Amino acid sequence: MDKYGILKHYFGYDSFRPGQEKLVDAILAGQDVLGIMPTGAGKSLCYQVPALLMSGITLVVSPLISLMKDQVGALNQAGVHAAYINSSLTDNQITKALAYAKQGRYKIIYVAPERLETWGFLDFATHVEISMITVDEAHCISQWGQDFRPSYLNILSFVKKLARRPIISAFTATATSKVRAVSYTHLTLPT
């Protein structure tokens, strides 16, 4: 299946919205991207479509449990095997989800940035193929990273511990120059 087949089969659309296809194509070509699109413009599809075409797992760093649950619920309803791993799960549920992911059951896994700093998750990530790391709501890196959620500033440190550097994508509706600069610096995105 190609990108159009994925778009139609899982998401029910015949064509991409303006700006989406360019980002999808860049990711599929192995390029890191920073996608800045208005709320409701379909940023999620820009990483979800490529995630389903790549061989490994896509990790989506997301700031809120409710966002993770909503995204995973919508993906599962569409027939996409996705999961979230966060503090709303018991240790047993986390262990089970990671085991399923190692077996190849999930293409997309949503996590909080703090999860990337745990030994158990790093152990998991070094034993599976991570094709892409996506930072959803990338403005959180600059807005929360300095004090409220410093784990946002450590995403690149996590990436450097992996055997192979995955594609890095980041998406936001907030396009201030500070957000762009911090995203480029802390995710090593191209300018």
Locate each region found by the language model.
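Conserved pre-motif I regulatory segment
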Residues: 1-36
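Walker A/P-loop NTP-binding motif
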Residues: 28, 44-57
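Conserved helicase ATPase motor motifs in RecA-like P-loop NTPase domains
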Residues: 38-39, 139, 159-177
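Conserved Walker A/P-loop ATP-binding site and its immediately adjacent core
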Residues: 57-75
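Conserved helix-turn-beta segment of the N-terminal RecA-like "Helicase ATP-binding" lobe
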Residues: 69-90, 100
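Conserved helix/coil segment N-terminal to the catalytic DExD/H
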Residues: 91-132
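SF2 helicase catalytic motif II
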Residues: 124-164
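Conserved small/polar residues in nucleotide/adenosyl-binding loops
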Residues: 185-191
